[in-house]
Amino acid sequence: MFLTERDLKENFWKNYNYSARAIRYQFEAPIREGCADLITVEMYQDNVQFNSFEFKLHDIKKAILQAKENSKYVHKSWIVI
């Protein structure tokens, strides 16, 4: 359980990227109005893949809308709750 979205982001990132799977990454990436919470560039099956992540503890409806908007610019768009 996390009290803040920042705690959620930090804990997620520590566990997600423990093996340095992301070639590059940026928090608060300006790919759309309002910024995506996290964008990663990764190699997946010998192909470069762009992923976006939205972190939400509340307002899941907003997270879905943000992830849908992000999906226009990335290969996969994820919601972390």
Q: What are the residue ranges of the model-derived segments?
A:
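A generic structural signal for short beta-strands and their flanking turns/coil linkers
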Residues: G34, Q49-N51, H75
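Conserved catalytic cores of phosphodiester-cleaving nucleases, focusing on short active-site segments
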Residues: F12, L38-T40, Q49-D59
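A sequence-level detector of short, solvent-exposed, charge-rich linear segments
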Residues: I31, S71-K72
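Short secondary-structure boundary/capping elements
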Residues: P30-E33, H58-K62
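Nucleic-acid nuclease catalytic cores
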Residues: K56-I60, V74-I81
